[in-house]
């Protein structure tokens, strides 16, 4: 019986990654724009990053996460359902948070996608109903983590490493 050859094959050549230098400019409102063009694929990616310094939320810990969960649920101009249906119709991958937004789609829809992204960021629709649902979800998540050893260990490590008054050392409670 012959032994199976299990020697590792020699690696092939590493691909060459060529990222062009971004074009940069500043809009009238002070927003810095970086553009990197690559026309090999018919897709476009947008990334909005808000330069928010970390801050201690104190007795309001969880507001940032709650805001992140609420943003992108429609806008003051468009209902949540219509907003989500249009995103689905265009086949867009769009995400919002309190720190910015990202969107990926086919480049032929880029104008409308950028409009939807701006609408969601500049005119978010925070309804009481959505607020109550998201708050309930956060509370349920915290209750589930009460008995999770990794979650408890992570909290302890963060408090010991950063202190309880540091943004990373804080943790959410039902009261906050």
Functional labels for PLM-detected ranges:
Residues 1-90, 102-105, 115-116, 175:
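His/Glu-rich zincin catalytic helix
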Residues 85-176:
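Acidic/histidine-enriched segments that form metal/cofactor-coordinating
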